[in-house]
């Protein structure tokens, strides 16, 4: 089943990057270098003190034993959507145990609560059967219109819950089709009020389990006060927390913008994309919590460097130069810089020096992680070279060949390792071994990334030097039109999301931090490639979202 947000029709007038064309310059320039945050240090201190007081009050109010199960389900969901769950993980864990152990009463408070419970448990890796939806289905197997159609919130919850499907769950295929059709009808007729109308529109673009957490929090804070039974304590804490986390993000973005300006101006590769603000937006979509600051910095810096390398292989270097760049990366030694053409030497030196700085930052007991990160980066250059060879030789790979290579060139395996390098002790040596082995979950996350990217390339047009993508290889191999092949790739994309859901529930708890990075990276890609756009390459497509996330005033405190 094709995901609802994918547009598979090709554009009649595609913008083309590559060859003699250049990527558009950054839409931000040095804006975040000079931007002065409206929150003073004194104000931030006062807000932090107030937030700590409110957290204590929430802990006192969060009495899982005294709440009924339906109320507990709603409370946990509210904490998560308001972006507060990282402050109450222990309480949420205990609450989920009770939610999973206790059955809801008959009809369980309606479709909304039944579906919400299903989604929450599955998102936390707790298996729950689709049998819970039997009460809302007819004898023939379809969903009962009389029970569901007059309940927009319930339909929305069903639609979101059904996107936690694993392969082969036909009941949830039916649920998606049923709920989507009715939600579209409701929106077109204007039959639902705010804020549910906005939540439906958002989910029809990207279902909640695939939507980035930070963006959902941004939207939900504005919507929550319009809920009939909203909790003023949670709302105040959520607003404070959002502003405090944003202040940290803006400091990080300023530091990264300064770092990137120095790097980009030093290496002098004008053919490469200048996209640090977009990279950082991507980063916050993956990990926004305060405790992951170092991981964000590692991710963003590495993403920037690998983007320079990727664009060199893709749109500028000759095949001979590609071979030399790959060989230099394998040797990983500044004394080998002479094998490179002059224009690539500074890129090579700066890459190695930045990795040295990464290692210096790591605590002694975490320096073992550098071996994994270097090997991942080296492997990335090998695979970029293979793509360059295919492109130069105009080789038409089989779909299987393309899929295997693109799992690695998606960047997800390498970037997962680089992100984990900035984690605390929860990222174990076993986690690095697991990601490095490219298990099924990492493969699925990489394929989500690649298929989204390739559907975008099909719609927008490819770089002149690009090798055939997933759509083109599938089209040639199966004798299909381009749009037919794109629809098939969209269906494969949906299947890979279901594999992600399944492997998340099966994984050993010691690997959960790494698994969550993989999931979050796939989520972040959904917003970058929404409706077939490529908001990384074409940064103007992301400008409004960046403005809203980092600059728009949160509702008055």
From Swiss-Prot:
It catalyses: (2E,6E)-farnesyl diphosphate + 2 H2O = 7-epi-ent-eudesmane-5,11-diol + diphosphate. Substrate binds at residues 310, 314, 450, 453. Pathway: Secondary metabolite biosynthesis; terpenoid biosynthesis. Mg(2+) 1 binds at residues 310, 314. Coiled coil: none annotated. Belongs to the terpene synthase family. This is Eudesmanediol synthase. It comes from Zea mays (Maize). The gene is EDS.
